[in-house]
Amino acid sequence: MTDPNNKTKRSMRSRIIVLILAVILAGGGWWTWKEGRPLFYGVQAYIYGFPMMMDLTRETATTVPTAGQFGAPVNQFAVMTEYPDASFRAVVRTGLDTLFAVAWADLDEEPLVLSVPDTDGRYYVIALFDMWTNIFASIGSRTTGTEAGHFMVAGPNWQGTPPPDVKQVYRSPSRFVWVNGQMRADGPKDYDVVNPLQKQYKLTPLSAWGEQYTPPQEVPYTANPDTKIPPLERISNMDAGEYFGRLARLLKDNQPLPADGPMVDMLNELGIEVGKDFDISRIDPSSAKALRRAMVTFSILEKAVHVMPTKDGWAVMPSDIGDYGTDYVNRAGIAFVGLGAVQPIDVSYPVAFNDSEDEPFDGASRYVLRFDRDQLPPTKVIWSVSIYDPDGFYVPNSINRYNLSAWMPLKYNEDGSLDMYIQAESPGVDKESNWLPAPASGTFNLVTRIFWPDSSVLDNTWQMPGVKKVQ
């Protein structure tokens, strides 16, 4: 049987050719290969480096003196003690089934020991992302269980012996690591249970292990007004010198992976050398011109991630999330549409921009998503459907509801089926428990989250039903 995931990946990869041609033709006129090759390389360099721009998310999160809900100094956890509202802008398409505890680890000086509590069976997962957005380790219910434990995270060049009470050593290929933890919380009623568990997450420098370590307070930092701007908006506003200059700086501490050799050769030909500063005014003029032209890739990438292969309007995220290899297109696409997405075996993310007739969602219309009794998402934990505006943020509404989750008091039909009403106005008091408020106008998109999904989700034998427009 043909693997649908392979079809998805092939389709996304093939779009790089269309993408590059679109950039080349955008300026009009005919190009020779000599003229077009730098641009061909420039677009690929842009796509290759795009996930590394998650460094802007790091900047936003760590430019604070003390740990809070949405930010913390380096090597400390920011603990989300309650679900955010529609004003949240730090990360796109964030979920509302799990409370996050997130840290940015700097492994430049020494390894860190990550300590987790006994969650008494409560579901949690901590994904360790390198700066290329690959997940090099996953800690939690599925992989390591829910008992307390200590795990060491070491940088690529560390040599030494871990403490005897460390369960496992995870080696990061990059200096910086995004420690992205989430723990199931069924709304405010669970906060009193989950918050104390979250606050037991801890990162301890190896040199302080065995001591009574307290993370530093009131850490000095340099205020940066740009951190108030959503990271994707900051990227879209960059010029070529800033974008590729930042990439060159990041490559000093976060080396390309061994399989990236051909891409590194392309970067070198463009004048972007690993470990060296980059100044666009000092490179070959044809390369500089190509890199400036390549910046339009952002807007084309934005469109490309919305046209993944779908069934009944739903696109299933590629199966290589978190383990991309040289699949740079998928890697950039996921960084664009859902930075922080974990591996499908932990969470599956069907996404819909269109209804069952493949028409874009419109806030002026009304929709119904119906699950037959035997069609409910198969999961070992929890599932939900969330709604977002075109930029990937919550849709403000009168009841402050941004998702419908299986733990909520949803009303099922007599035959066991479930209807969700997706529209701007209330469907009526008797149906309001199943109402997912949409914007009054304009487009929106939906993300289903299936935590620890059944194998039928992973092999696509189970699929989401289409969202039908109400006539």
Regions found by a protein language model. Name each.
Residues S14-Q471:
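A compositional/structural signature for long, glycine/proline-rich flexible linkers
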Residues M1-S11:
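N-terminal Lys/Arg-rich, disordered targeting/topogenic segments
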